[in-house]
Design a protein with these regions (language model features):
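Cleavable N-terminal signal peptides of Sec/SRP-targeted secreted and luminal proteins
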Residues: 8-24
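Prokaryotic Sec-type signal peptides and long signal-anchor helices
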Residues: 22-23, 49, 71, 250
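Short linear motifs in intrinsically disordered
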Residues: 23-26, 52-60
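Glycine-rich phosphate- or other oxyanion-binding loops that anchor nucleotides, phosphorylated ligands
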Residues: 29-31, 59-275
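Short, conserved "active-site rim" segments that organize catalytic pockets and cofactor/ligand binding
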Residues: 31-55, 64, 71-75
Length: 276
């Protein structure tokens, strides 16, 4: 009798796990988080949709900002990394550390409040590789993310250092937007150095940024499907200095994001994940 009960309990647990793993695939998307590193990247979109600041969303010790509202049938939460106060520079908190912390805290808060995110979109600017067909202003949707500057030459640590994570599949969305698809490689430096070059090639990178891999990692910890929407501001393997090209095209890229993101939300809202 005890053995039969144990088998029944085991079967019930397995069934529960299977149902839980399939919930994401079969549930409709109506609660979306959009993680954007820089204020200049986020502001046009936030203003366009009239999203409102939520000053109680993050702990007061953090520099992060949240904006909430609705677009169609979707609840939206836009989070940005805020400005640096630790080093007293006042610049945007770019890079993997603030991106991972902001994303983790966002998904944690929403999960604990029984308001779990159905999808996370990492939106922002990026460098593009001309060898992969990238041009200034192109919109890319990520197929995967990886790191190009976490070099840990110890066998078991190599895959951890690269940290490759697949994005949720968005082929239908790419066709709808006429966007390109590709891998986003992440590092904590804006410029391009030869020491990173081979790692970017190994990652099969189409675009390069400073946050995507960190945001994907935080999303994975909360089992939230994720992908990136990236607009090219500079050509990594081109002739112009990255910083000059970046600032030259940042305004145009932010406007392109403003135009693309509502279309992204319109497409994903009320769809199942396997329809993206």
């Amino acid at each position: 009798m005890c053995e039969a009960m144990a088998m029944l309990l085991k079967s019930a647990v397995i069934l529960l796990l299977l149902l839980t793993s399939q919930t994401t695939a079969f549930s409709m998307i109506s609660n979306v988080v959009i993680a954007i590193a820089m204020e200049a990247e986020a502001s046009p979109f936030v203003n366009h949709l009239n999203l409102q600041p939520d000053t109680t969303f993050f702990p007061s010790q953090t520099p992060f900002h949240a904006f909430t509202g609705k677009h169609g049938n979707c609840n939206l939460t836009v989070v940005t990394n805020g400005k640096d106060s630790v080093h007293d520079t006042g610049v945007d908190n770019v890079g993997t550390v603030p991106a991972a912390v902001a994303t983790f805290l966002t998904l944690q808060k929403m999960s604990l409040e029984d308001n779990a995110a159905h999808l996370l979109i990492n939106a922002g600017t990026c460098g593009g590789f001309k060898r992969k067909g990238a041009e200034i202003g192109d919109v890319f949707l990520t197929t995967a993310v990886a790191n190009h500057d976490r070099r840990i030459p110890i066998p078991d640590f190599v895959p951890y250092g690269v940290g490759r994570i697949a994005s949720t599949s968005v082929e239908n969305l790419a066709s709808h937007l006429d966007a390109k698809l590709g891998v986003c490689t992440t590092g904590n430096s804006l410029d391009f150095h030869e020491v990173d070059s081979q790692h970017m090639i190994d990652n099969d990178a189409s675009v390069k940024d400073m946050e995507a891999a960190a945001i994907a990692w935080a999303s994975e910890t909360w089992n939230v499907p994720h992908f990136g929407v990236k607009v090219v501001t500079d050509i990594v393997d081109g002739d112009k200095p990255t910083q000059e090209e970046f600032f030259e095209n940042l305004g145009t890229a932010a406007k392109s994001l403003q135009e693309a993101l509502p279309r992204v939300i319109d497409f994903v809202c009320d769809k199942k994940h396997d329809e993206l």
